């Protein structure tokens, strides 16, 4: 069996969400609330649950972070792309998933999360009509613009690594062949 070389989770982790609507803002609000000690990470496998390691007399229960390198919640920096220019606080209020009383304790942090312009084609999400979109001549130009956004976000926020999460609307089926 080939050995893996898992690197430690050091430095800031940039979490970029494609879409800044109900799913993304609920996720962000939850992480920010846990960071402030205002909520427990119930439902978060990596933060709250334990996993059994070993059998019989050797078995013990460890947190995931004690087994694999996982970023500390305090090291996460959020960013997003969205077709609408509203910041994460405005989007969370508009989504009406969480109550305002639950969002307000992290209002300042959410207001700082302003979406970058989305790489968007109206043909794939006909019910969306936002104006916060990239003006690109080709798909390749969109790809290059997104790559630049990621590099710029990483540098601006001092992140050592970036993950991108899909939390956007998906409407249309496009056959591959």
Which sequence ranges carry the predicted segments?
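Metallocofactor- and cofactor-centric catalytic cores in central/energy metabolism, strongly enriched
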Residues: 1-177
């Amino acid at each position: 069996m080939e050995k893996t070389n898992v690197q430690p989770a050091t430095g800031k982790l940039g979490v970029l969400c494609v879409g800044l609507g109900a799913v993304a803002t609920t996720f962000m609000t939850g992480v920010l609330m846990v960071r402030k000690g205002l909520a427990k990470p119930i439902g978060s496998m990596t933060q709250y649950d334990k996993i059994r390691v070993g059998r019989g007399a050797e078995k013990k229960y460890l947190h995931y972070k004690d087994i694999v390198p996982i970023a500390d919640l305090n090291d996460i920096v959020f960013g997003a792309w969205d077709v609408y220019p509203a910041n994460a606080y405005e989007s969370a209020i508009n989504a009406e998933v969480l109550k305002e009383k639950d969002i307000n304790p992290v209002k300042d942090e959410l207001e700082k999360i302003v979406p970058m312009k989305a790489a968007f084609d109206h043909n794939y999400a006909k019910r969306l009509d936002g104006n916060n979109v990239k003006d690109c001549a080709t798909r390749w130009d969109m790809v290059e613009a997104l790559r630049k956004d990621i590099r710029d976000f990483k540098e601006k926020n001092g992140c050592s690594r970036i993950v991108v999460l899909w939390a956007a609307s998906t409407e249309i089926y496009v056959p591959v062949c």
